[in-house]
């Protein structure tokens, strides 16, 4: 199973890529994290947030792996603990499908995409830069995996 992070945005600062890569490389071969960047829609005064999100939805859907479990990150999503994520990983692995975590653009995710997702997940009640969410998600996926392996990284 592969874990895909499909994220609207590009040209992230170097420290974002460094942080993301650090956690992605720690993952075992059977649970690799792959980042798929989606170009954000150009914004102009004549474009509504809905039209921007709809255009980004089409790009996101094109980047999603076929038959992947879609987990949309959304401020109104469910709050999960790291332990809940750790419990989900083995179940997802048994299911055999790839998992795609979707990070929207500045306006969020299109409602059609959110309704397609099997899970709406909130990463934090705080407002975070989207690039930082990539790093945070990669770290939490690594931490969840380390819990399933009784690895000393997680010391709760």
UniProtKB/Swiss-Prot annotation:
Subunit structure of this chain's protein: Homodimer.
A GO molecular function held by the record: rRNA (pseudouridine-N3-)-methyltransferase activity
Alphabetical list of SUPFAM superfamilies matching this protein: alpha/beta knot
EC number, UniProt record: 2.1.1.177
Keywords: Cytoplasm, Methyltransferase, rRNA processing, S-adenosyl-L-methionine, Transferase
Keyword Transferase appears in the UniProt entry: yes
Record field: transmembrane: none
Record's function text: Specifically methylates the pseudouridine at position 1915 (m3Psi1915) in 23S rRNA.
Superkingdom of this protein's organism: Bacteria
Species for this entry: Burkholderia thailandensis (strain ATCC 700388 / DSM 13276 / CCUG 48851 / CIP 106301 / E264)
Gene Ontology CC annotations of this record: cytoplasm
Similarity remark: Belongs to the RNA methyltransferase RlmH family.
Residues given in the record as S-adenosyl-L-methionine binding sites: 73, 104, 123-128
Cited HAMAP family: 23SrRNA_methyltr_H (MF_00658)
InterPro entries: Alpha/beta_knot_MTases, RlmH-like, tRNA_m1G_MTases_N
Reaction(s) this enzyme catalyzes, per UniProt: pseudouridine(1915) in 23S rRNA + S-adenosyl-L-methionine = N(3)-methylpseudouridine(1915) in 23S rRNA + S-adenosyl-L-homocysteine + H(+)
Alphabetized NCBIfam families for the sequence: PRK00103.1-4 (NF000986), tRNA_RlmH_YbeA (TIGR00246)
Pfam family, one: SPOUT_MTase
Name assigned to this protein: Ribosomal RNA large subunit methyltransferase H
């Amino acid at each position: 199973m592969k874990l895909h992070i499909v994220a609207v945005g590009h040209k992230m600062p170097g420290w974002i890529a460094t942080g993301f890569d650090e956690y992605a490389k720690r993952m075992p071969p059977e649970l690799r994290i792959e980042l798929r960047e989606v170009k954000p829609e150009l914004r102009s005064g004549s474009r509504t947030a809905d039209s921007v999100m709809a255009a980004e939805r089409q790009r996101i859907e094109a980047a999603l792996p076929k038959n992947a479990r879609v987990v949309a990150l959304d401020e109104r999503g469910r709050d999960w603990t790291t332990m809940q994520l750790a419990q989900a990983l083995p179940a997802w692995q048994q299911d055999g499908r790839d998992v795609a975590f979707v990070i929207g653009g500045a306006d969020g995710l299109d409602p059609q995409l959110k309704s397609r997702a099997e899970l709406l997940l909130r990463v934090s009640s705080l407002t975070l830069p989207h690039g930082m969410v990539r790093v945070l998600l990669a770290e939490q996926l690594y931490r969840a995996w380390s819990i399933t392996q009784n690895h000393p990284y997680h010391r709760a």
